[in-house]
Amino acid sequence: MDFFGRHFDDILFHLQKMREKGKISDTIHRRGLGWPLADKGDLVMGVDTAVELGHPKEGSTAFLIWTREPMRLRNKRISVLGPDLHKLVGKRIPFGKIILLGVDGFNENNSYKRYRQLENVRYDIRLKGYMMRGVSQYGREWSRVSRSAIDDGFSFPILGGALVDRYLEFKFVKTVEVVFFTSGRRDMKPFLPIAENALKIIGAMNKMIEEVSYDCDTCEYSDICGEVEDLRALRRSLQKRGKTTDA
């Protein structure tokens, strides 16, 4: 199932425009960067923090989408729109992160389960000097980077590379791109409506599966289901499976 075709079109269009303006720094990840893992219980305390990304007072946007056309992506590309971490020391900044995945074999029976597996990856990234401070279902992500990590050369290519490696451990993921935004709200602005719409699709999937709710008349996601055929196909499949189970 391909819920996000239009979202990919829009994201790739805006990224290309920004590349043409020289606003984006791209690197291709190579395995074996060798950044140490965090020990269990490691924390980045406020006094040790060099950079705070996406503090609630500054705002953040983080989301993940996929396409059934893996070749649309440049595999293992990590893009940074704005300064890298060593240029942000002492700051608390608005932050954006987009994960773009090229996948294989998604259908109405497995799409949501696979999405949950992919979504959980951000909780699995445990790198020394990097700490996820908070996340939410509304596309927010707040993290900290320590002074010692910055001194040792921690960067977005290292963080992005860890994400790339982890996603590619799933056999159904064929290509990955990671995009980070650190230049402020103005450059993130074109992507915010895309994020909002994508998160509505995820919310609709969650309501159908976790709440087992198919009442379109009372559902707050009825408008988005009207726009996305694959959501309607998922709904029909779930209803059919429910009737089979009840029989």
For the regions a protein language model found, what residue spans apply to each?
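Cysteine-cluster motifs in flexible loop/terminal segments that predominantly coordinate metals
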Residues: A195-R236
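A broadly conserved sequence feature marking short terminus-proximal activation segments
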Residues: S143-K207, D217
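Intrinsically disordered, low-complexity segments enriched in charged and polar residues
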Residues: Y130, S136-G139, S143-G161, D217, ...
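Charged, amphipathic alpha-helical stretches
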Residues: M1-T67
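Surface-exposed polar/charged interaction patches
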Residues: M18-K21, K91, Y138, F170, ...
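Extended, amphipathic alpha-helical scaffolds
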Residues: P56-E58, P70, S213, T218-E220, ...
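N-terminal accessory interaction module
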Residues: V51-A149
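Short microdomains enriched in Cys/His and/or Lys/Arg
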Residues: L231-A247
